[in-house]
Amino acid sequence: MSRLHPHPVALSKRQRSIAELLVLLIPLVPLGCDGSAAPRIGPDSANAAEGVQMGVSSSEARFVRTIIGFSGPESVRYDPDDDVYYVSNMKGAGSVKDDNGFINRIRASNPDSGSVLVQGGKNGVTLHAPKGLAIHGDTLWTADIDVLRGFDKHSGAPLAMIDFAPLGAVQLNDVAIGPDGTIHVTDTGIIMSPKGVIHTGPDRIFVVGPNAQISVAAEGFQLRRPNGITWDPVGKRWIVLSFDQFAGQIMENPQGSTPPKLIRTRDGGGQLDGVEVLRDGAVLFTSWADSSIHMLANGRDKPIIREVAVPADIGVDTKRNYVLIPLSMLGHVQLWSLDGVVRPQK
């Protein structure tokens, strides 16, 4: 069991009401416009309608563009080897095994050129509600409820399936690769149905080692619904975020299977989702509570992008110095430049 000792965060009655409403609405909002398996990707011609103009005026980072046509986009991963973006699409409630999830492959040099790389229910593929993405060699890994699936990142062909159901996995969420090649997977412990979201637990962090052996690195309520996870090559540690709506925790643990320890509890509330570490060690993370992307550096936490509704599992385009933000409830992915905020990521 984790030995982490969180400190509860006091929120106003209004903040608590908003947070609870957001959690309940997630699976009820239609994700996709036309019901097709692969909505057409393209540029957004109505930025003002989603609050982009307000966010631009109050953000330190620079807004570049919005790409539309996704269906519940949950995670964006940049592959510097091929200069492409991968986007996972849940298309519906996040715990329903409906075999209609899909993953887009998009050329970073021309984001309107996206295509469907992996489609549930076709070509021998099973894919329900893909969430976190990670790349290891030529394999694209994604968390899919209680299974970790691996696909060829070029052809989309299924390569591997690691079943966590025998361990009682509830909601596998984010995926990250360690420097030793192990795969770390968070289990947020929530059920996302068309009727709402229920936290059943257990909250866990799994590690997949050689020969697909699964072990538990940390477990317990103290993890507060672990969500985003990433390896920090600068600090030589894992960074883990909590999705608890009232206690926004940022946690760390060194390489190995020791339980995470608390780095910071956010005064502004919880519902932390995606996390990335930049080359200088700065930590970027998303917050549903204040609809922002934050940067944690030198002990200081500051929002650098504002007015982004329900930002999910972000990626970083290291060639262009962009942060890539999936907006699940809108079916959009936004691109923001970090120039002027942090140095280029090459």
Residue ranges and their predicted role:
Residues 33-36:
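Bacterial signal peptide processing site
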Residues 50-73:
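A short helix->beta-strand "capping" segment at the edge of beta-propeller domains
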Residues 62-67, 112-124, 157-165, 213-219, ...:
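A short beta-strand motif characteristic of beta-propeller blades
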Residues 70-82, 93, 121-139, 166-190, ...:
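Beta-rich, blade/repeat-based domains predominating
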Residues 87-99, 186-201:
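Short, conserved, GDST-rich strand-edge loop motifs in beta-rich repeat architectures
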Residues 91-95, 147, 190-194, 244-248, ...:
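Short glycine/acidic-enriched loop and turn motifs that connect beta-strands
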Residues 99-104, 147-149, 203-206, 249-251, ...:
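A short loop-to-beta-strand structural motif that recurs across blades of beta-propeller domains
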Residues 107-111, 152-157, 208-212, 254-258, ...:
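Short loop/turn segments that connect beta-strands within beta-propeller blades
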